[in-house]
Regions:
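Catalytic core of DAGKc-family lipid kinases
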Residues: 104-183
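Redox-cofactor binding/interface segments in oxidoreductases and associated redox assembly factors
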Residues: 17, 75, 187
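ATP/NTP phosphate-donor binding region
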Residues: 3-72, 84, 113-128, 139-149
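A residue-level signal for conserved active-site and pocket-lining positions in enzyme catalytic cores
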Residues: 20, 74, 78, 100, ...
């Protein structure tokens, strides 16, 4: 079972709204959402720039004040938007509900066509909160941590723009796992098992399983296979690519360059992402609908990255 709890009926005083401004319908949906919530006696707030663009600058709050005031956050965008908000709010432990304005919408629970129904379900307590495991990644150079970040989906270590292989040597809790020569490796959460890892041959892992996945990317050997590892383990990836570009990406959105001899350390993050889910919609139903039943333009999926890796 996924770690969940029923929130039950609770009078929500303030709901935050996060908006991806690049989505054509985002501001219109945000305006409608604001009206419906205020009609029901719920206050709303936004990020300062979004509030200003909507014409309500008084509703814009900086992050710390935003996080201290809201009890729940609605996210208007796609999966990429939700990933960014999950990373931003994880340390505040605020539940988030995604409204899909993107292409795939695998992580988003609600559709904007059912906006009023979704708001009613939230205000009546008709939902559960799922605790999704997150990752913390550190780049270690000459014994010192030089970069770090957290991920909900995955941490990718990959070659740069030229078609030359890199070598990744993996250790779990100091024990040698294997050496992977190819395009790189992915360390993912169960939530991320349906993302980049899946396209590289990794398994779909039920979100409630406490595990980490290690998936090779185009490994140049017949014996390299994805591995499912304990969630409490510490994974060290030693990278080697003399005179070649390589880098690390976090949820496909944040990137750092790597150098020969760097170590990427990945472990479970101390906080979980709190995702709002409907009780009558199962993970397997979403898998069937999103990954089997829909025609997806793969050239556009994942196009919501907020940043590009610098390699």
């Amino acid at each position: 079972m996924i770690a969940t709890w029923l929130l039950g009926w609770k009078w929500l005083k303030t709901i935050g709204i996060k908006v991806n401004r690049s989505k054509p319908k985002a501001f219109a949906v945000a305006e409608k959402m604001k009206r419906e919530l205020e009609t029901r006696g719920v206050a709303v707030c936004f990020e300062p720039d979004i509030a200003a663009d909507l014409g309500y600058p008084e509703l814009g709050l900086p992050l710390e004040e935003f996080a201290s005031r809201v009890e729940l956050v609605f996210v208007l965008g796609g999966d990429g938007t939700l990933l960014g908000v999950a990373r931003q709010l994880a340390r505040y432990q605020i539940p988030i509900l995604g409204f899909n304005l993107g292409n795939l919408g695998f992580l988003s629970e609600a559709e904007t066509g059912g906006l009023s129904e979704a708001i009613e379900r939230v205000l009546s307590g008709d939902y559960v909160i799922e605790c999704r495991l997150m990752l913390k990644a550190e780049v270690i150079r000459n014994g010192r941590v030089i970069e770090s970040g957290v991920a909900l989906n995955d941490v990718g270590i990959a070659k740069g723009s030229f078609g030359r292989m890199i070598t990744c040597t993996a250790y779990m809790d100091g024990n040698f796992l294997g050496t992977y020569t190819g395009d790189g490796v992915i360390i993912s959460t169960p939530t991320g098992s349906t993302a980049y890892s899946l396209s590289c041959g990794g398994p779909i892992v039920y979100p409630g399983i406490r595990a980490l996945l290690l998936t090779p990317i185009c490994s140049h050997t017949l014996t390299s296979r994805p591995m499912v590892l304990p969630s409490e383990s510490v994974i060290d990836i030693h990278v080697s690519a003399v005179h070649r570009e390589m880098g690390i990406t976090i949820d496909g959105q944040i990137g750092y360059c790597l150098k020969e001899g760097d170590i990427v350390r990945v472990k479970r993050y101390k906080h979980s992402a709190l995702l709002i889910k409907w009780q009558d919609r199962s993970f397997f139903e979403v898998v069937r609908q999103k990954l089997q039943g829909e025609s997806v333009d793969v050239s556009r999926v994942g196009g919501e990255h907020e940043g590009t890796a610098p390699y």
